[in-house]
Amino acid sequence: MASSDKAFKLDIVTPQKLFFSGEVTSVIAPGLDGLFQIMKGHAPLLAALKSGKVRLSLSDKSEDSFQIEGGFFEVSGNKAILLTEDVS
């Protein structure tokens, strides 16, 4: 499968494990001040997250969602990392 030119690398990590590592085209996450969306080319960012639903648009055009228990989201270059206490 070829990587989309709109995709970027995302890792979702808990203290126990690497929950997700792959290419996504969009992430919607619950920031402390409300939902925010990240797409390829976003400016560098470090944001605190509250508990809530995270939605991913994957590079194969499918979607996925899950609940997180707070954490932090970092965007730097063409990579993003979501650190959370727990994910389900």
Curated annotation (Swiss-Prot):
GO terms for molecular function: proton-transporting ATP synthase activity, rotational mechanism. It is a peripheral membrane protein. The keyword Oxidoreductase does not apply. Its main location: membrane. It comes from the Bacteria. Keywords: ATP synthesis, Cell inner membrane, Cell membrane, CF(1), Hydrogen ion transport, Ion transport, Membrane, Transport. The keyword Transport applies. It holds the Pfam family ATP-synt_DE_N. SUPFAM superfamilies: Epsilon subunit of F1F0-ATP synthase N-terminal domain. It is found in: Cell inner membrane. GO terms for cellular component: plasma membrane; proton-transporting ATP synthase complex. Produces ATP from ADP in the presence of a proton gradient across the membrane. Belongs to the ATPase epsilon chain family. F-type ATPases have 2 components, CF(1) - the catalytic core - and CF(0) - the membrane proton channel. CF(1) has five subunits: alpha(3), beta(3), gamma(1), delta(1), epsilon(1). CF(0) has three main subunits: a, b and c. This is ATP synthase epsilon chain. It comes from Chlorobium limicola. The lineage of its organism: Bacteria, Pseudomonadati, Chlorobiota, Chlorobiia, Chlorobiales.
